[in-house]
Amino acid sequence: GIFSSRKCKTVSKTFRGICTRNANC
């Protein structure tokens, strides 16, 4: 996971803003 900007936090709320491989950030 990658700590991205606001887009990641909105997409992965459960992961505390952590971007997963399947998440589009």
UniProtKB/Swiss-Prot annotation:
Keywords noted in UniProt: Antibiotic, Antimicrobial, Cell wall, Fungicide, Plant defense, Secreted
Biological process, per Gene Ontology: defense response to bacterium; defense response to fungus; killing of cells of another organism
Compartment(s) of residence: Secreted, Cell wall
Keyword Secreted belongs to the record: yes
GO cellular component, one term: extracellular region
Cell membrane keyword on record: no
Tissue: Distributed in the epidermal cell layer of leaves and in the subepidermal layer region of stems. Not in roots.
UniProt record similarity statement: Belongs to the DEFL family. Group IV subfamily.
Function, as annotated: Antimicrobial peptide. Active against Fusarium spp., Gram-positive and Gram-negative bacterial pathogens.
Full protein name: Defensin D3
Organism field: Spinacia oleracea
